[in-house]
């Protein structure tokens, strides 16, 4: 990442999110209030690094013994996650290492998003962002702040908030009704594929899914 926005990258991210991908990016390790891309793009979930003392990782003022860097902050920050001496596997003796930075904080959030999707694969990116917000622990100034965003991500609380999928709820409004049938018919006629419309889980949207959906509504 860096301090310069790139239109082609932003367009790619917007396209990816519009098609259901969750985009999560590290805020950078410059220890200033500044834009850092791609984290500063609106469609990205921007993740900063937290020190072991549950505050934004700073430089010489940090509570840990890592004075050489700090987590970049600003109004683009959504969340913080642990970012100091995070363990990881490595192709070396012992097969492990540890590393610092917002690049070590970011995977925590990506992992939580993956767990949320494993509970309900029909969640869209904005719903995942909102449930992460609701589940986060507010560790900075009350409410949102530019140093820690909405707070420290909390896997347990965010996953608890994930609703179980409802078979046939194509528009994800919590109910199964004629609106879902209309959407499924439209998707089939225009030859596209929507995961929530694949009622029989055979990898395609077709008349069989419509028949099953109608049965669900009538039961």
Per-segment meaning from a language model:
Residues 156-169:
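Low-complexity, Pro/Thr/Ser/Gly/Ala-rich linker/spacer regions in secreted
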Residues 50:
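Carbohydrate-associated surface elements
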Residues 100-102, 144-151, 169-175, 197-205:
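A glycine-rich, coil/turn loop motif that links secondary-structure elements
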Residues 125-138:
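Short, well-structured alpha-helical segments that form the helix of a local strand-helix-strand
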Residues 7-11, 170-193, 202-219:
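Alpha-helical segments with a strong preference for the paired helices of cellulosomal dockerin domains
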Residues 1-43, 53-54, 73, 89-107, ...:
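Substrate-binding/access-modulating region of protease and related hydrolase catalytic domains
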Residues 112-120:
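Alpha-helical metal-binding/catalytic segments enriched in His/Glu/Asp
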Residues 47, 79, 101-103, 112, ...:
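Residue-level detector of buried hydrophobic side-chain packing
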């Amino acid at each position: 990442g860096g301090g310069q926005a790139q239109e082609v990258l932003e367009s790619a991210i917007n396209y990816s999110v519009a098609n259901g991908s969750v985009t999560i990016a590290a805020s950078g390790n410059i220890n200033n209030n500044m834009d850092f891309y791609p984290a500063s793009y609106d469609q990205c979930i921007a993740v900063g690094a937290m020190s072991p003392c549950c505050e934004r990782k700073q430089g010489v003022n940090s509570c840990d013994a890592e004075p050489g860097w700090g987590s970049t902050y600003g109004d683009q920050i959504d969340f913080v996650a642990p970012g100091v001496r995070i363990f990881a596997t490595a192709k070396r003796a012992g097969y492990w290492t540890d590393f610092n930075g917002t690049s070590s904080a970011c995977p925590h959030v990506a992992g939580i998003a993956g767990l949320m999707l494993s509970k309900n694969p029909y969640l869209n990116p904005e719903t995942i962002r909102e449930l992460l917000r609701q589940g986060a622990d507010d560790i900075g100034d009350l409410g949102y702040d530019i140093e820690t965003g909405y707070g420290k991500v909390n896997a347990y609380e965010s996953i608890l908030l994930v609703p179980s999928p409802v078979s046939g709820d194509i528009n994800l409004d919590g109910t199964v009704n004629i609106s879902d049938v209309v959407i499924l018919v439209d998707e089939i006629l225009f030859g596209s594929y929507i995961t929530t419309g694949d009622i029989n889980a055979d990898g395609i949207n077709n008349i069989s899914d419509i028949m099953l959906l109608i049965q669900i509504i009538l039961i």
